[in-house]
């Protein structure tokens, strides 16, 4: 690494040395020497030294069974520590210009002021900001919570070490604590003993809120408020909430039988309990701050002649919160507790606090009002008393199943066999009817009972506790109307927004027609009251058609949905179901947002934050603030300075690119007779099922092939063997065809002028740097039957061709030359990830050949390599 990253290198070196000390103390000097030899050989191998590469392979192949687990753990833990150092570096005082983005909000306001926009337009856009970040528990977060907690403490220690005026004994104390934490991590099992339950996942999400987002939000809001004041002379309203958080943890039951109505109800109570507990802590602290005596008449009317009027007001809240906390604690623990003076709405907390705020300003104490009191008001606006809203997601087939059972019971035939027109007529008739549809004596199947119970849970809770109801694999208007009828039958008194999820290429292309039909229904127009949500699926469309074709289908779908919304005077919020990887729509937030069609952000931004990406983007308060600043600046830019509409010649090229790339992708993934056996042999796909990653099964149908495999394990498996196939397969064929047709100049123009296309190429470059042809070949030679080697050789050649064609279109000399920080970050981790790949091949070979006699420690070692490679690749699923 060059001198720009000296501070990062120093921290990585220090943490590595301390890990080495822990290893030596536990395993002895000879073992540590072996680890160091492997590390040096891996670095030399990376530089192209063939002799050292062979020595590396020999050393790892000849490890005894007893050595495999500790060697795997050593490299896996080093990668985790490198990630800690890297994440800290982005928020450290020494973070160089090449690494840290200058304050994106400051840059954005400068950019907006330099444009011809009026102040009013900018102020209006800031006030209309509506960013909803949806935390999901997709099973790619392989790091245990206990280790994450130690990593957060390591970050705090690295931050403390940066202080220039530390006394020697203070510095020694911090270094000793770092050594303790590294040692604790080494002696902690990095693999969970059991899969987390959906409630465990929800608790993990709540912990992210408590430890990181709770302190980050007021700081982020203060920063935005100050920028607005400095540049435009106005302030954010007290109830402003430009960013809010929703969760799928405990609400997403699509393909997860463990997320039941009971689980959803429990998670709702836990969220409320956590929110009340956090506000109770804050209000207690606020009570000690608000000791002032001057107040307005409005406050006096509430508290009488109390000498400390603000404390008197806030103490009432504190007592209410304490009683609510006790009540909810008893409820969560399954104990009976009488209902008392409980906090049931956010307004109950907001009203007295706002009264204090305005009084302090009126009495010349605005500086005090704008301290902790304002911070609590900002948290109330963002989190409310439910902490995060809960989305509900279910497969559309499950709703149809309810009506099939019911219509058969009622002697009306089978709903599933009806035409779309007949389904709509039936559903609308029942939606308009005042009598109940479901007979009290009907005994549905367990699955149907579960669907009905979920709707009852929604009906029984506060509307503010919920986000939206998402229907997976929605393909017709009846899919949406069916959910609305189920909610009505459950006694739901509020209009829960229902969003179809269009996720295959075919569904994306048909999505606008589905919405057009829905909007032609008067009842439906009345129900939505001018507000519509539509979810765009990135994972399944890419798995279905390949990254390039899926990207264009998503863009075209968004564009036509935006036009439909404008024609119908609707506020449309597009909900982006992105993952961390390129194969699942992942891209740096700023680039991803600015590559959307013009007008697609007018209804706000709603996007999933998945698995390990939650930790990388929001795991530390300062990192979370950075991420929130980036999102905010990107949405403002996307709305006020939108990207250009694509030229007709760009569209024509993209249509051809999408068609050619999709055909090639499907010819391999669906059409090649050797593909499925090759995939199963060349990747740890079968073994991934053993890793206790998340609560959701990895397959929709237990015995299905690739098509039944969820998008996440599909991507995860290809990331492990470093072929990274879903992120690039097919794209190169489309690009090669366009160049052969004389369109190279148009492609270069698209790369320069069109953010959508440029982002596609940049994401490919990042994937190519993480991919590795010799490692992918090593998996083949050791694990794949010889008769399947031909396909592996073909795919590796296609990877090489893909790199070549992308470099032809990019002005810089090498991959990611214009993004040096990302390039250095990948280069830092590669020498530590490579030995884990070689070890994984060795372990897979031993596991598959001697499954019956395999030592349990080898199974554990295999799991460690999977987790370690995930840490090395960062965005794994």
From Swiss-Prot:
It catalyses: oxaloacetate + phosphate = phosphoenolpyruvate + hydrogencarbonate. This is Phosphoenolpyruvate carboxylase. Forms oxaloacetate, a four-carbon dicarboxylic acid source for the tricarboxylic acid cycle. The keyword tRNA-binding does not apply. Its cofactor is Mg(2+). GO terms for biological process: carbon fixation; oxaloacetate metabolic process; tricarboxylic acid cycle. Keywords: Carbon dioxide fixation, Lyase, Magnesium. PANTHER family: PHOSPHOENOLPYRUVATE CARBOXYLASE. GO terms for cellular component: cytosol. One of its GO terms (molecular function) is phosphoenolpyruvate carboxylase activity. It is an enzyme of class 4 (lyase). The active site is at residues 138, 543.
């Amino acid at each position: 690494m060059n001198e720009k990253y000296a501070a990062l290198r120093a921290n990585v070196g220090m943490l590595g040395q301390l890990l080495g000390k822990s290893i030596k103390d536990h395993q002895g000097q000879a073992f540590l020497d072996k680890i160091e030899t492997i590390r040096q050989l891996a670095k030399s191998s990376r530089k192209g030294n063939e002799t050292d590469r062979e020595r590396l392979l020999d050393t790892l192949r000849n490890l005894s069974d007893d050595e495999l687990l500790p060697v795997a753990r050593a490299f896996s833990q080093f990668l985790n520590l490198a990630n800690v150092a890297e994440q800290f570096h982005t928020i450290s005082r020494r973070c160089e210009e090449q690494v840290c983005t200058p304050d994106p909000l400051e840059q954005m306001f400068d950019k907006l002021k330099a444009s011809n926009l009026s102040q009013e337009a900018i102020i209006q856009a800031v006030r209309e900001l509506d960013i909803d970040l949806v935390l999901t528990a997709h099973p790619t977060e392989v790091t245990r919570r206990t280790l994450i907690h130690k990593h957060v403490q390591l970050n705090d220690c690295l931050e403390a070490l940066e202080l220039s005026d530390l006394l020697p004994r203070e510095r020694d104390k911090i270094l000793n604590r770092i050594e303790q934490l590294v040692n604790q991590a080494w002696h902690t099992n990095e693999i969970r003993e059991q899969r987390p339950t959906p409630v465990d996942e929800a608790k993990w999400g709540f912990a992210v809120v408590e430890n990181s987002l709770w302190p980050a939000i007021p700081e982020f809001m203060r920063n935005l408020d100050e920028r607005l004041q400095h540049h435009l002379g106005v302030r954010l309203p007290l109830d402003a909430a430009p960013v809010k958080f929703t969760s799928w943890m405990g609400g997403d039951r699509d393909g997860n039988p463990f997320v039941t109505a009971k689980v959803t109800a429990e998670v709702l109570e836990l969220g409320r309990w956590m929110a009340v507990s956090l506000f109770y802590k804050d209000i207690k602290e606020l009570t000690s701050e608000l000791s002032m005596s001057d107040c307005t008449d409005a406050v006096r009317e509430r508290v009488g002649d109390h000498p400390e009027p603000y404390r008197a007001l806030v103490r009432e809240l504190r007592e209410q919160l304490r009683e609510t906390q006790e009540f909810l604690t008893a409820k969560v623990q399954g104990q009976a507790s009488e209902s008392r003076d409980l906090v049931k709405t956010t307004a109950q907390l907001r009203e007295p606090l706002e009264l204090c705020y305005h009084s302090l300003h009126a009495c010349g104490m605005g500086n005090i009002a704008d301290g902790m009191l304002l911070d609590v008001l900002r948290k109330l606006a963002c989190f409310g008393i439910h902490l995060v809203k809960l989305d509900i997601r279910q497969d559309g087939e499950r709703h149809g199943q309810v009506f099939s059972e019911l219509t058969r019971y009622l002697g009306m035939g089978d709903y599933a066999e009806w035409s779309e027109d007949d389904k709509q007529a039936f559903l609308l008739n029942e939606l308009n009817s005042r009598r109940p549809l479901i007979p009290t004596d009907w005994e549905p199947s367990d699955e149907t009972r579960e669907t009905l119970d979920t709707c009852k849970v929604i009906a029984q809770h506060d509307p503010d506790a919920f986000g939206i109801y998402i229907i997976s694999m929605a393909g017709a208007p009846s899919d949406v109307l069916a959910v609305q009828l189920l909610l009505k039958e459950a006694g739901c008194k509020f209009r829960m927004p229902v969003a179809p999820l269009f996720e295959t290429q075919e569904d994306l292309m048909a999505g606008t027609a589905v919405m057009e039909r829905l909007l032609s229904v008067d009842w439906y127009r009345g129900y939505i009251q001018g507000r519509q949500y539509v979810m765009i699926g990135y994972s399944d469309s890419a798995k279905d058609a390949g990254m390039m074709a899926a990207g264009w289908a998503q863009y075209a779908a968004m564009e036509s949905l935006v036009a439909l919304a404008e024609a119908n005077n609707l506020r449309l919020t597009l909900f982006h179901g992105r993952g961390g990887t390129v194969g699942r729509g992942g891209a740096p937030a700023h680039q991803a947002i600015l590559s959307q069609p013009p007008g697609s952000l007018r209804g706000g931004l709603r996007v999933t934050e998945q698995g390990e990406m939650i930790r990388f983007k929001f795991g530390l308060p300062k990192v979370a603030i950075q991420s929130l600043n980036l999102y905010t600046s990107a949405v403002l830019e996307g709305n006020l300075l939108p990207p250009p509409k694509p030229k007709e010649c760009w569209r024509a090229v993209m249509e051809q690119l999408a068609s050619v790339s999709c055909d090639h992708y499907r010819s391999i993934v669906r059409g090649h007779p050797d593909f499925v056996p090759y995939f199963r042999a060349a990747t740890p796909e079968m073994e991934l099922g053993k890793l206790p990653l998340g609560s959701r099964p990895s397959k929709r149908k237990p015995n299905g092939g690739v098509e039944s495999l969820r998008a996440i394990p599909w991507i995860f498996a290809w990331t492990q063997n470093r072929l990274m196939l879903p992120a690039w397969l097919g794209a190169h064929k489309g690009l090669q065809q366009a160049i052969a047709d004389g369109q190279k100049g148009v492609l270069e123009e698209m790369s320069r002028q069109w953010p959508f296309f440029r982002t596609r190429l940049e994401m490919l470059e990042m994937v190519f740097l993480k991919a590795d042809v010799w490692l992918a070949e090593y998996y083949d030679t050791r694990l794949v039957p010889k008769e399947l080697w031909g396909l592996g050789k073909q795919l590796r050649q296609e990877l090489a061709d893909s790199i070549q064609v992308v470099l032809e279109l990019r002005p810089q000399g090498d991959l990611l030359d214009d993004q040096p920080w990302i390039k250095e970050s990948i280069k830092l981790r590669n020498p530590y990830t490579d030995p884990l790949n070689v070890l994984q091949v060795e372990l897979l070979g031993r596991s598959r050949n001697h499954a019956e006699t395999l030592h349990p420690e080898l199974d554990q070692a295999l799991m460690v390599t999977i987790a370690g490679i995930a840490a090395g690749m960062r965005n794994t699923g």
